[in-house]
Amino acid sequence: MEIQDYTDSEFKHALARNLRSLTRGKKSSKQPIAILLGGQSGAGKTTIHRIKQKEFQGNIVIIDGDSFRSQHPHYLELQQEYGKDSVEYTKDFAGKMVESLVTKLSSLRYNLLIEGTLRTVDVPKKTAQLLKNKGYEVQLALIATKPELSYLSTLIRYEELYIINPNQARATPKEHHDFIVNHLVDNTRKLEELAIFERIQIYQRDRSCVYDSKENTTSAADVLQELLFGEWSQVEKEMLQVGEKRLNELLEK
């Protein structure tokens, strides 16, 4: 058995624990809603977590694949062996956990917020279809953050984590970040054309909702294109200055 392998019983044990902790204090819904989340690394997707938690008065289960990586039975050994490259070896475990949780929790009709990047169209399309077949209203929420700002955030996050625990710090490869950014608009357009989402919303980091398909007739992809690659607002310029200052402070430590 390789170090990245895990047994079926180890996986089931972790799954049962996640089901218990994620549903604590939550109720199932007669008309469940599932929100798929998209945006590049460092864009600030947790902003949407907070908005939706408030909107649903806490009655929504957040499924975030990254949070399951550390549950891999050999996580510490993988960290020691591969350092920051260990993400490649925990990917399978975390992905399978997300899939299993979505299947189980949707059968129980909980409101769901499923974290993703929208790197491809296939995963959100498949997930949306599965949930629609189970009677869910499926929505898409995107966070639109200028690529320079999101990549800067990944660098800050890495340095902050590195100070706490060098083994656990996870750098985001720039090509991985840029790949998501460069496909975000096209993938949003494809998903819009498939018309599988009953609602598409676009948020910015300052928590403002800048697009809602229930109110806007324009294309979400066009709005996203402008927000990602168009003119910089004053707020964005200030965010960049603050971020660069923070990164320099961390690098000087």
Swiss-Prot record:
It holds the Pfam family Zeta_toxin. Gene3D superfamilies: P-loop containing nucleotide triphosphate hydrolases (3.40.50.300). Induction: Conflicting data is available; found to be a member of the pezAT operon (upon ectopic expression in E.coli); in S.pneumoniae strain 0100993 is found in an operon with the 2 following genes (SP_1052 and SP_1053). It is an enzyme of class 2 (transferase). Disruption phenotype: Strains with a pezT/SP_1052/SP_1053 disruption have partially attenuated virulence, they take longer to develop a terminal infection in mice, although they grow normally in liquid culture. A double SP_1052/SP_1053 disruption grows almost as well as wild-type, showing the effect is mostly due to disruption of pezT. Its EC number is 2.7.1.176. Changing K45A: Abolishes lethality. The keyword Nucleotide-binding applies. ATP binds at G39, Q40, S41, G42, A43, G44, K45, T46. Keywords: ATP-binding, Kinase, Nucleotide-binding, Repressor, Toxin-antitoxin system, Transferase, Virulence. The active site is at D66. It catalyses: UDP-N-acetyl-alpha-D-glucosamine + ATP = UDP-N-acetyl-alpha-D-glucosamine 3'-phosphate + ADP + H(+). GO terms for molecular function: ATP binding; kinase activity. Belongs to the zeta toxin family. Toxic component of a type II toxin-antitoxin (TA) system. Phosphorylates UDP-N-acetyl-D-glucosamine (UNAG) on the 3'-hydroxyl group of the N-acetyl-D-glucosamine moiety, yielding UNAG-3P. UNAG-3P inhibits MurA, the first committed step in cell wall synthesis, which is then blocked. Upon expression in E.coli results in decreased cell growth and viability, followed 3 hours later by growth restoration; the toxic effect and phosphorylation of UNAG are neutralized by coexpression with cognate antitoxin PezA. Acts as a corepressor of its own operon with PezA; it is not clear if it binds DNA alone. Forms a PezA(2)PezT(2) heterotetramer. The heterotetramer is much more stable than either of the proteins alone, and a specific mechanism may be necessary to liberate the toxin. This is Toxin PezT. The gene is pezT.
